[in-house]
Amino acid sequence: MSLPDLPGFERLRFDTELKSFNGLLSLFLSSPERVKASGKKVVAKSPLSPVDPIYASGALAYDPYTYETVVNVVINEDYDLTGEALDAGVNSDFNPWNMIMLGSVFSGKNKVPIDIYSTACGCGDDQIKKCWQIMAEVKGSPLQFWEIPRFESETEKWALDFLKKELQQLFKYLASQTGKEITDDALADAVRRGNLLRQDMLDLTRLLQSSAIPISALEFYIAQLIISDYAQDPEALHDSYRQLIEELEERVKQGVVAPGITSDKPTRIYLMGDETQEFQLFNIIEQYGGALVGCDSRLSLYYEPVKESASVLDALARWIWNMPHNMPTAERVKATIPYIKQQKPDAIIISNVVGSRNLPGAERLVRDIIGEELNLPVLSVETSLPLEDIEKVDYQIRAFIEMNAY
C-alpha cells in the first residue's frame, strides 16, 4: 500500500501488505473531489447522527467532526485551527474534535463545501449545538436540530412516538432544502444501503475474534471512522469494505496475523469510550505486545441493522432510540458487555478525550461494571490533540500490557 507524502502519515505505521485498505483510504481522502463533482447538496451531521434520512432526500451526508479533524490535524498537522475555534467564540475546554471542526469551517479551510447543517442532538450535546450554530451563522447556511430522547425503558411508547414526529419534521425540512420528498420507498432504499454497511462492520469486527488477528489496530479504527457519513457514496464504501473483508478472510483461513502485531501471543485489547485523535495509540498497543480485538467508539451505529420487514419509519425510530450512545452510562456499558465478550479480550482500555463529556465523569462506574461483568483489568487513558499526551500514553499502555501479558 502506498500512502500520500503527508507529515501525519510519516509518524504512523501502516500495514503495507493490506492492499484493499489502500482503496478504502483513497475513497475517504477523495471526498472533496467527489462531492464537488456530484452536484448534490451536502448536509453536515455529527458522528452519531443517523444518515439514512439524508441519503433518502437525495443529498450527501458529511461528518465534518471526523473528516476535517483527520485530514487537517492527524494527517496535515495544522494545529493552528484550535486558535481559529477560539476566535469563533468557543471555550478552550471544548473537546479537540469540535475545536478542529469549528476552526476549519470558521477559517474557510474546510475541505468539503457544506450547504445545510442538520444534526440529531441528545443529552450532553451542548458542544455540538454551539459549534453548529456558529458554523451555520458564519457560512449563512440553513440550520436544523432534531432531538433524540434519552433511552428509558419505561418511557418507550412516548419516546418512540416523539422520535417518529421528530423524524417526520426532519423529512419535511430536508425536502424543503433539497427539493426531493422523502417517500417510504426512498427511505427504505436508504435503510437497505445503510444495512449493507452496518453488516460489513459486524463482519469486520467478527474477524477480530480469531486467534490469528488479521487486521492491525490502526486500519480497523480508520475503517470504523469512515462509516459515520458513508464516505458520501454508500455503494462505493460497501464495495471497499467487502474487498477488505475478503482479503482479511483469506488471512484468517491461512492463519496469517497482521504484520503490525509483534507478539506471538498478544494481549487482546478492547478499546471503549471516546474516539481519539492520537492515532499513534494504536501502533503503541501493538508495539508493546497487544492487539486490538474491538472498539466501541462507533459501534452504536451498527450493533444491529435496522429491521426491513416492519414499517420503515417505526423501524428506524426504534433503532435510533436503542443506540447505546443514547443510553445512560450504566445501561450503555451493560448493553456493550455482550459485544465485548464476543471479542474475547484479555483487557480493556477506556479512551477519554480532554473536553469530552462522554465517560470521564462516570469512569468509576464504568470500571465497576466491567469488573463485575467481565473480571478484566482496565486502563484509562486521556488524549487531546495528536502528540500532546503521547509520552504519557506510551508509558501507560506499555506498563499495562506488560502487567497483563500471558
Residue ranges and their predicted role:
Residues 2-41, 164, 168, 172-299, ...:
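A charged, amphipathic alpha-helical module
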Residues 3-5, 364-406:
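Peripheral docking tails and interdomain loops at the edges
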Residues 43-110, 132:
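An N-terminal, globular interaction/scaffold subdomain
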Residues 55-83, 270-341:
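Redox- and metal-dependent alpha/beta enzyme cores, enriched for Fe-S-associated oxidoreductases
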Residues 103-108, 327-343, 361-365:
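A short, acidic, amphipathic alpha-helical segment used as a generic capping/interface helix at domain edges
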Residues 107-207:
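Internal, well-ordered alpha/beta segment that forms a basic, Gly-enriched binding/recognition surface
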Residues 113-114, 344-350:
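Proline-aspartate-enriched helix->loop->beta-strand connector
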Residues 124-130, 356-364:
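Glycine/threonine-rich flexible loop motifs
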